[in-house]
Amino acid sequence: MAHADVRNAFTAAWVMQVSFDPLLLALSINPHHSSYGLLKDGRAFSVNVLKKGQLALAAHYGRPAGPDNKLALMEWTTGRIGVPLLLESLAWFECRVVGEHPAGDHVLVLGKVIDGKLLDSKAEPMAYRETGGMDGASALFPAVFGD
């Protein structure tokens, strides 16, 4: 995400394509997450698809923002619409926010894809199951689902 001169990145657990025409992606973010304010103000975001085996990178961007610049230690460039693009990723997409929808304790943010690039055609994408539950979501599921 980007707004004015501020850039940030976070690991999103849920990202999906929702339309071909126009090409739309959706991501889910906790509205109490510090990145949500930047996303709302900047109205743009990038999706950087991590490669299988880049768990340390996912963990780095999954930690709370705080005063440190999470982008400082990584190679990145600025995209056409000002959002950070990770040069180590498998692929990236630049998106303009076109809508939001409340979804329980998260918000679904809809983005129109403005640009994208495949950086490594031989790599496989990281899947959520490879993260080992680093977001702690498995602890939130009830032992038994009721009515």
Enumerate the language-model features and the residues they cover.
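Basic, polyanion-binding surface patches
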Residues: 1-147
